[in-house]
């Protein structure tokens, strides 16, 4: 098993997970890389490939992704590409990974011209979730991860949306009880799994999962993946989509009010005014979902 994680997650969970695997009879290759969007690229993947090749891993090997969404994307891409594909397992440790990115088989790395432009669909054999890992996350990471949860409530689940209106602060402060947290993660994972099952390769309904992401990804690219977490950029994107929908008359004023209020309670990052609108618009033209001109 190639156990792939980043430096931050390794400090918390690498040795317990590696030891557990060894006790179960697995040979474990520990692969630790710097992490972050700035290393989620072909150069970063090349470093992981080199370690797998040097260790002599063959097609019977598995890759285990231990960490957040970036680790899952990177390790999944490596698994999809190494020897034309080996099995992999997702062990997500952040909200965004547990409710969204670990489910559905999207893997990929960034290019200087856009986010996730190089990748493959490669389904994990297993997704193993331990919600206790969420309680060690800094608040900023929790807020960013909750962007995907709010998104699910908006696009698919009125009951979930109402739950978030009642308890969003409990979640971001991690004062929420264990049972409620387990329900929240399971509910969201179920939403993502249902959409993906209906449209694995994003030819139709799966596109709704990109709510707020077209503009969000463009903001990330326009700021060189250094200013905002992914979820923070999605918050901007969702608010922009709400404005566009309202202008087009497809979002009722009362729903718009609830929509914007929940995003603002989650927390809108600062500093976007310094980013040129044209730079953001230009990045949307390189979006992987773009059709035609």
Name each region found by the language model.
Residues 1-62:
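ATP/NTP phosphate-donor binding region
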Residues 2-6, 147-150, 250-293:
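C-terminal charged capping/lid subdomain of soluble metabolic enzymes
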Residues 3, 41, 92, 130, ...:
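Residue-level signal for inorganic ion chemistry
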Residues 12, 70-77, 98-99, 217-218:
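Short glycine/serine/threonine-rich phosphate/pyrophosphate-binding segments
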Residues 63-66, 70-84:
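A generic, well-ordered mixed alpha/beta core segment in the N-terminal half of proteins
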Residues 77-169:
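A glycine/threonine-rich phosphate-anchoring loop and its flanking beta-alpha core
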Residues 168-227:
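Oxyanion-binding "anion nests"
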Residues 214-258:
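Internal helical hairpin/lid segments
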């Amino acid at each position: 098993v190639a156990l792939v994680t980043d430096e931050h997650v390794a400090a918390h969970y690498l040795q317990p997970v590696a030891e557990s695997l060894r006790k179960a009879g697995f040979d474990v290759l520990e692969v630790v890389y710097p992490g972050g969007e700035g290393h989620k690229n072909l150069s970063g993947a090349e470093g992981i490939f080199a370690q797998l090749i040097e260790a002599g891993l063959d097609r019977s090997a598995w890759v285990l992704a231990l960490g957040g969404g970036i680790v899952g994307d990177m390790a999944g891409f490596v698994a999809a590409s190494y020897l034309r594909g080996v099995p992999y397992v997702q062990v997500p440790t952040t909200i965004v990974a547990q409710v969204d990115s670990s489910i559905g088989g999207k893997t990929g790395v960034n290019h200087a011209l856009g986010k996730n432009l190089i990748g493959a669909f490669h389904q994990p054999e297993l997704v193993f979730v331990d919600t206790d890992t969420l309680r060690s996350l800094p608040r900023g990471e929790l807020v960013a991860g909750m962007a995907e949860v709010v998104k699910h409530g908006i696009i698919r689940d009125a009951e979930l949306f109402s739950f978030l209106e009642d308890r969003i602060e409990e979640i971001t402060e991690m004062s929420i009880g264990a049972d409620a947290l387990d329900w929240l993660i399971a509910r969201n994972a179920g939403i993502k799994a249902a959409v993906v099952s209906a449209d694995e390769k994003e030819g139709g309904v799966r596109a709704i999962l990109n709510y707020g992401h077209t503009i969000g990804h463009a903001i990330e690219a326009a700021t060189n993946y250094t200013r905002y977490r992914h979820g923070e950029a999605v918050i901007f994107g969702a608010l922009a989509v709400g404005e566009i929908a309202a202008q087009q008359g497809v979002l009722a004023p009362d729903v718009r009010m609830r929509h914007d209020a929940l995003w603002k309670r989650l927390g809108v990052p600062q500093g976007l005014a310094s980013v040129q609108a044209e730079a953001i618009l230009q990045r949307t033209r390189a979006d992987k979902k773009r059709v035609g001109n």
